[in-house]
Amino acid sequence: MNQESSFRAPPKRRARGSNPNVSTPHQLFDDTSGGPVPHGGEYPNHSSPALGIPAQAFLSEPMSNFAMAYGSSLASQGKEMMDKNIDRIIPVSKIKYYFAVDTVYVGKKIGLLMFPYMHQDWEVRYQQDTPVAPRFDINAPDLYIPVMAFVTYILVAGLALGTQSRFSPEILGMQASSALAWLIVEVLAILLSLYLVTVNTDLTTVDLVAFTGYKYVGMISGVISGLLFGKTGYYIVLAWCCISIVFFMIRTLRLKILSEAAAEGVLVRGARNQLRMYLTMAIAAVQPIFMYWLTYHLVR
């Protein structure tokens, strides 16, 4: 037997750690610190945008939520401050009360303005020291009818001027401006008179605008009657409306201007009470003057 062929080379020993995938018997855990090497010898790029998106989203969502919450709080504070400042100048919450009407109230109120002679109860109803809304009390003042009547008066005036070939935007604008100016002058004169007479009343400026604006209902009726039946119809209807508004104003304002005496349940006599009565009658008597002054030139 050949000596060279019978000689076997000793087996080659593999160096420790040459194969990272095979663990030694005494090693409890695999050593993965090196990590598998990707094919092609390329290593992962840690600056890849795909790995940064979750972190950016995690950081950006709290910031965006905080910004939205901060912005909404600023908006709510600004709205609250603006509402307070507006309410100081114009009592919006109180003005809403004067527009709380419905169709039934409007119909009954116009009927009361045209035919107030059969009405008995003129007291304004209260609920917990607060007057009820106009739609629940026909005696409560409102702004819906005066505003709509003023606008309708301007439209009817334009129609009357058009039938007489005198219509122009300038003339209609002057008509609206003069009517509004006279209304403001009337309200200011009443406020000054109440101040000079030192009347302790619950009448507000908005109440005076409402009561003095009711005369436009009669003015509209007079002008329409003049367009349909001529001057005769105009004078008859306007005279009826003037008497009705005088009666309505006396019965309504008497309770407002004499509210101090009515609250005490006694009839106050003397010079002060006479001034109050004269003031009530003067406010009522001036209504027909304005009704005629603002409508006579519209009927020919």
Curated annotation (Swiss-Prot):
Record Pfam families: YIF1
Chief location category: endoplasmic reticulum
Protein name: Protein YIF1B-A
Keyword Transcription regulation recorded: no
Membrane topology, from the record: Multi-pass membrane protein
Region (Disordered), start-end ranges: 1-46
GO CC annotation: COPII-coated ER to Golgi transport vesicle; endoplasmic reticulum; endoplasmic reticulum membrane; endoplasmic reticulum-Golgi intermediate compartment; endoplasmic reticulum-Golgi intermediate compartment membrane; Golgi apparatus; Golgi membrane
Known role: Involved in the anterograde traffic pathway from the endoplasmic reticulum to the plasma membrane and the organization of the Golgi architecture.
Keywords, in A-Z order: Endoplasmic reticulum, Golgi apparatus, Membrane, Protein transport, Transmembrane, Transmembrane helix, Transport
Residue intervals on the Extracellular side: 164-178, 227, 300
Location in or out of the cell: Endoplasmic reticulum membrane; Golgi apparatus membrane; Endoplasmic reticulum-Golgi intermediate compartment membrane
Parts of the chain that traverse the membrane: 143-163, 179-199, 206-226, 228-248, 279-299
InterPro entries: Yif1_fam
Organism in which the protein naturally occurs: Xenopus laevis (African clawed frog)
Family: Belongs to the YIF1 family.
Superkingdom of the organism of origin: Eukaryota
One GO process term, biological-process aspect: endoplasmic reticulum to Golgi vesicle-mediated transport
Topology feature Cytoplasmic, residues: 1-142, 200-205, 249-278
